[in-house]
Amino acid sequence: MRLILLGAPGAGKGTQAEYLSKRFSIPHISTGDILRENVKNETELGKKAKEYMDKGLLVPDEIVIEIVKDRLSKEDCKNGFLLDGFPRTIAQAEALDKVLEELGQKIDKVLNIEVPDEKILERMSGRRICKNCGASFHVIYRPPQKEGVCDVCGGELYQREDDKEETVKKRLEVYHAQTQPLIDYYKAKGLLVVAYGQEEIADTTKEVLKALGIE
């Protein structure tokens, strides 16, 4: 099975990607991870990418695509893979089609995990992290026994910048603007399937399997 996984930040994409990777014995390929790996291992592509990253610039498509191509040509991708974080644009999607054609492969399905924005906002802006031990809490779903204090070590709980309401709203706006054309692109190709994210992880997994036609 060759899958592309779409989903807004906070939609629970990472958890489902891990599950699907284990269930189907296919590698979970996160573009962020393979980019960092190439930089760390000082590969030719990694060195090129690092020049941009060091300047705080986005790594150009042609480098990202080469890195993805290199990863997809590895032995463990022969029977399938799960792509997460790529493609992000129509240009990248078209480039991916070409890469797969060269490798004699094609995408089976594009899975979009949909969660209403207000639900994501509640999930993310309610998160609190312990400054001392890193334990995670949630003001609604997993509140600490004493407000602002970690149950584990008694450390102070704080809200990460990334989880502040305004930041989350901005990230969601950017995500929708960027991803909608991609959703339309794969819908037109008849590859798009949708799973509706639920409160419980296990219920989302059921939705995901149903969307993929696996009960």
UniProtKB/Swiss-Prot annotation:
This protein's domain notes: Consists of three domains, a large central CORE domain and two small peripheral domains, NMPbind and LID, which undergo movements during catalysis. The LID domain closes over the site of phosphoryl transfer upon ATP binding. Assembling and dissambling the active center during each catalytic cycle provides an effective means to prevent ATP hydrolysis. Some bacteria have evolved a zinc-coordinating structure that stabilizes the LID domain.
Organism: Caldicellulosiruptor bescii (strain ATCC BAA-1888 / DSM 6725 / KCTC 15123 / Z-1320) (Anaerocellum thermophilum)
Job description of the protein: Catalyzes the reversible transfer of the terminal phosphate group between ATP and AMP. Plays an important role in cellular energy homeostasis and in adenine nucleotide metabolism.
Subunit comment: Monomer.
Location of this chain's protein in the cell: Cytoplasm
EC number of the protein: 2.7.4.3
Catalyzed reactions: AMP + ATP = 2 ADP
Pathway(s): Purine metabolism; AMP biosynthesis via salvage pathway; AMP from ADP: step 1/1
Keywords per UniProt: ATP-binding, Cytoplasm, Kinase, Metal-binding, Nucleotide biosynthesis, Nucleotide-binding, Transferase, Zinc
GO cellular component: a single term: cytoplasm
Binding residues for AMP: T31, R36, L57, L58, V59, G85, F86, P87, R88, Q92, R160, R171
Major localisation: cytoplasm
Enzyme class, broadest EC rank: transferase
Protein name per the record: Adenylate kinase
GO molecular function: adenylate kinase activity; ATP binding; zinc ion binding
UniProt binding sites for ATP: G10, A11, G12, K13, G14, T15, R127, S136, F137, Q198
Source organism, top-level taxon: Bacteria
Positions of the UniProt region annotated as LID: 126-163
GO biological process, one term: AMP salvage
Family: Belongs to the adenylate kinase family.
Record: residues binding Zn(2+): C130, C133, C150, C153
